[in-house]
Amino acid sequence: MKVLLVNGSSKANGNTARALAEVAEQLNVEGIDTEVFQLGAKPIRDCIGCGLCGKLGGRCTFDDDVVNELIAAAEQADGFVFGSPVYYAHPSGRILSALDRAFYAGGHAF
């Protein structure tokens, strides 16, 4: 079994990363493989609902950020943990945009 831990913070070594590392450690103790996926600090586009992902085999037409990499990593995972800093009672915009596009384009992987 493999669990993908998605870090929705732009800070690779911030509090969200520490929390995900704790989760990964406990999963590893239970014999579960883990992979941490860092969304990074670069901008992530919003989904525009163009529908081209249906013609691209479950990949988003925007190929200039990490969303297609996230979909590819999700295809190899059996479970997910999503981590995000909380800004004004919401997860980061970065993780929301990434998940909107990943679920729309690559929903089969989730």
Predicted regions and their residues:
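Glycine-/small-residue-rich active-site loops that bind phosphorylated ligands and cofactors
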Residues: K11-A12, K42, Y87-H90
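N-terminal beta1-alpha1 ligand-phosphate binding loop
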Residues: K2-I32
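Short, glycine/charged-enriched secondary-structure capping and boundary segments
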Residues: R18-A21, G49-L52, R94-A98
